[in-house]
Amino acid sequence: MPQPVTPCLRQGRVNREGEALMTIAIGPFSLERIVKAVEKVRQRLLRAAAALRAANVPYAVAGGNAVALWVSRVDESAVRNTQDVDMLLRRQDLGAAKAALESAGFVHRHVAGLDVFLDGPAAKPREAVHIVFANEKVRPHEPLANPDVSESEDAGLFRVIALDALVRIKLTAFRDKDRTHLRDLIDIGLVDATWLAKLPPIIADRLRQLLENPEG
């Protein structure tokens, strides 16, 4: 019979003198905790979407959840879970969105220059709804602005960003996790070489790189 694993402390980073800077609490292995973590993200998305919809605030689910939603339409076994809940909305609607989300229990904060809504006053930054502003660049050096919320589709309980717009966002950001999300879309056939002709040249080149060298 398997023996329970006793929680323990593990030293984390150390300074140059070898002194521990932090400790990490390690609990037992648990599939239930994994399932619970995924469900928390799902419920956070649904609560936020319901609050925005009830307040008539235009929005669209973006980010990793949008990728997962599109992937699931083709192959649910290829879905990659994400801890982020990203919502695309217009900056002029932030005030209305703030009132709506706070009424649903979220707490507005500025974190690293971003607008986030923590899932309660004691929530961690990971346990939050992250706002992505439509028609604006996330970072000044990026080649394209985000799409408008009108580029979205009704998914029943929420609106999700359209595939074309999602791909443009991911190619514009092009961080490691964005490339991973693009590979997921490529692997199941939602994105292929036919996309190159309809994309702005600067991000079409990025897609070409991924198509020619997926592991690069």
Task: Enumerate the predicted regions with their spans.
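Compositionally biased terminal segments of proteins
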Residues: 2-216
